[in-house]
Amino acid sequence: MSCSAHGGGMKVNGSTILEGERIVLVPYKREHVPRYHEWMQSAELLEQTASERLTLEQEYDMQRSWFQDENKCTFIILDKKKWLQPEMTEIDCMAGDVNLFLNDNKLDIAEIEVMIAEPSCRRNGFGREALLTMMNYGANHLGIKKYEAKIGCGNKASLSLFHKLGFVETSYSDVFNEWTLQLNVTEGIQEWLAEATNHVSVHNYPFRPRNTTSSDH
């Protein structure tokens, strides 16, 4: 979606695709909204993401607002296996989303969150790869030095995932019943992120792989 490099006004990822091993990250566009709205009818997802149920029109407004907000950086997660099939639309490939929320006062700190909304896409490593890809992107392109994640205490899967990525609890909110976890992007962490995502390729949006079986005219 949109995200400026330290308030410079340039929407860094507005036309960026990040192609990984299992997933592809694309900017959150208007055409993605109906499927996203379907996902957010789930009481489970609403609880896990601390979100309120919105109407479809409100969801369109939210997408437009986020696209214009330079302190928010959002990618839709696509299932790469589906994405490689020419007959599949981008909407058919949608699996979830991954987000960065930059701190207005400290632009080198970002809250990060991930959601794998499609049940068939869970437990496939999508969330881990999306987080690593986003964290490396944020560190390299946005100058992020610290990541924060806010996770409900009942969301054991997310807590486990973030722990495995090196995040540690720094505080607990009784009001929201959630943990705040943090990870400092040290030189060692940045090297680890670069190595963990060295398979990721960057394309300009929109992009789909060419069908290599078709003739080139």
Predicted segments, located by residue:
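Active-site acidic-Proline motif in GNAT/NAT acetyltransferases
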Residues: 118-124, 153-154
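Conserved GNAT acetyl-CoA-binding A-motif
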Residues: 109, 138-152
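Conserved alpha-helical elements of the SDR catalytic core
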Residues: 134, 138, 165-166
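Conserved acetyl-CoA pyrophosphate-binding loop and the N-cap/start of the following alpha-helix
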Residues: 121, 125-134
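Conserved active-site alpha-helix within GNAT-family acetyltransferase domains
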Residues: 128-129, 142, 153-171
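GNAT-family acyltransferases
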Residues: 2-121, 141, 168-217
